[in-house]
Amino acid sequence: MKWSEISIHTTHEAVEAISNILHEAGAGGVVIEDPYDLVKDRDDWYGEIVELNPDDYPEEGVVIKAYLPVNSFLGETVEQIKQAINNLWLYDIDLGKNKITLSEVNEEEWATAWKKHYHPVKVSEKFTIVPTWETYEPASNDELIIEMDPGMAFGTGTHPTTVMCLQALEKYVHPGDNVIDVGTGSGILSIAAAMLGAHSVRALDLDPVAIDSARLNVKLNKVQHVVTVAQNNLLDHIDEQADVIVANILAEIILRFTADAYRLLKPGGRFITSGIIQAKKQDVKDGLLAAGFFIEEVNVMEDWVAFVAIKP
């Protein structure tokens, strides 16, 4: 089988949105080539187990590569991807160069092209994310291993916004808690909450691709007895109270349901949010305060912001 590699030269700000567009288009594996990875302080990420080749990275911006099967629908699929990316300006997302190129690769090249970019990553005091094909021995009995397959939608969960959410969950989820994960994507945050001892976790997403991905990952990590994956639009028609609500999605989407999050949280409950670029930081802060929240933490990693807000 032949594959077409689609390469998009863009900005840090656009990475997550474009990655989701590619996965929704049926991409088999997505690679993010970010030159910041070559120079970032590894201590910030608890020691990443990686081997990086500078020749694989652009001098500026970010290159996202994905692999699409070569078939009669390829041209139409590529045009849909281009249109969806161009529409991101409606959300004030800077696309940078927005240069899109195509090249053909064979099955063998595709099978290894993106795997070389993924290795075990320790993202917090407890959590290490491990690709399914890697053999990894925990450094201690307290280390929690989340297995992820980057071939599934939404990657391995090592994006800064995901890392900050994982770190916040580790701090604020307690045994017996009820947790709601809005816009679950791969399900990684729901899996983490379950591993931390949550009594029940609701993993919600409107995208059927995300639902399938989350269910597969939940089963892979053997937490299906705790995590319920369901298709739902944000917090619409959700009534049960939660100790923690987490959402790693665009700032504009977060602002649509801050009032619902406040309504569903128990007193003292926390709303953990990320997916927020620096330019949207004040907008989200204002929205949280207007809903009645107290801002407990504001964390920053690279160009991204995460809030921990508490319901008094």
Swiss-Prot record:
The family database entries (Pfam families) matched by this protein are listed as: PrmA
The Gene Ontology biological process terms listed for this entry are: methylation
Catalysis: reaction(s)? L-lysyl-[protein] + 3 S-adenosyl-L-methionine = N(6),N(6),N(6)-trimethyl-L-lysyl-[protein] + 3 S-adenosyl-L-homocysteine + 3 H(+)
Q: What is its main location?
A: cytoplasm
Report the GO terms under cellular component.
cytoplasm
- Give the UniProt keywords, A-Z: Cytoplasm, Methyltransferase, S-adenosyl-L-methionine, Transferase
Question: Which residues are recorded as binding S-adenosyl-L-methionine?
Answer: 162, 183, 205, 248
Tell me where it resides: Cytoplasm
| Listed EC numbers | 2.1.1.-
One GO MF term attached to the UniProt entry: protein-lysine N-methyltransferase activity
According to its UniProt entry, the function of this protein is described as: Methylates ribosomal protein L11.
Q: Spell out the NCBIfam families in the cross-references.
A: prmA (TIGR00406)
PANTHER family the record matches: ELECTRON TRANSFER FLAVOPROTEIN BETA SUBUNIT LYSINE METHYLTRANSFERASE (PTHR43648:SF1)
Family assignment from sequence similarity: Belongs to the methyltransferase superfamily. PrmA family.
What is the protein's given name?
A: Ribosomal protein L11 methyltransferase
Species of origin: Geobacillus thermodenitrificans (strain NG80-2)
Q: Which gene encodes it?
A: prmA
